[in-house]
């Protein structure tokens, strides 16, 4: 129970870290159609960070990397990913629903690649380097195994987060966060097939290429239906918003309180955010957020939206910060002697470099590519406003 009190300094330092970082490393906030979604994203990524901090807290003592025994900390990971998947499905299905012209599928898939790849490849190569460093830069596997694991890490771990150069549990270096990316790609590649049911045309060439890539990912990565339910709920929300664009009742403070109550029930009674009832609760909460419920103006605030911009980098980078600190700066053996209070105070301190590095990554890796892609080609549809995705 005391562990929940340790979160207080974590969130206090987060607040000041985001404020100060945005004063020093300035990034403008774009006009978007759903600012509440942008505001939500940053918190989701930070909850994933806390999820992995709890896992590390157990791992340092037991050497077992396993889901948190705490309902809250398990929801920090699982429910946050559920929301990420719903956001992806909602935004892209909404774009299809708002399409009045032909959809440029070639640009769509290229833009997705260049949106995800730059920040990812930097972190993936960092994982590879750390694994190589921890094996004393000696090649411990044959060339074919080395290339196989390297290729898997480069291409979003579609063949799994393979151990690199015989470094056991290589995935722990980045806290295993890459597993969600193949599922993102599965949805991206399913989109033209979904579009057919919405009378959005796609050529046979597009369907063949997308179908081939989809088959390759599913063949190597596999697919768990339980992870696809979140995308389905995101699709349903998109159709509902398209048919009923506004709902003042769902954006009220009373509904905000009701939404928080659902979250509390979900966390208290369920250990997993992937079970049907927690999924249903999450879908309802996401629905009211899309209906401009900002939860007492928190999600639509400039603070939340600035924090939300670094979501992807924060998601990818936090595991590296934890691993480098715990393994190479402090040392796992010394970390074992930390009391729980000492450990969570250390986590509080690590919030600062995590936010700063994520801000730098967004500004100098993600944002230039986002702007470059936008300048080169214009989407084959005219969205009502630009939603950065």
Protein language model annotation of sequence segments:
Residues 13-23, 359-360:
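Alpha-helical transmembrane segments
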Residues 87, 91, 232, 284, ...:
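Transmembrane alpha-helix boundary/anchor motif
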Residues 41-44, 74, 78-81, 96-132, ...:
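Transmembrane alpha-helical segments and their boundary/interface "anchor" motifs
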Residues 2-18, 35-97, 119, 315:
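Functionally critical transmembrane alpha-helices in membrane proteins and complexes, commonly lining
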Residues 22-36, 50-73, 94-106, 163-167, ...:
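Alpha-helical transmembrane segments in multi-pass integral membrane proteins
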Residues 65-79, 107, 117-185, 189, ...:
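Membrane-interface helix-loop-helix regions
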Residues 46, 128, 189-196, 215-216, ...:
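Alpha-helical transmembrane segments of multipass membrane proteins
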Residues 4-11, 38-43, 79-87, 178-190, ...:
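Membrane-embedded alpha-helical segments of multi-pass membrane proteins
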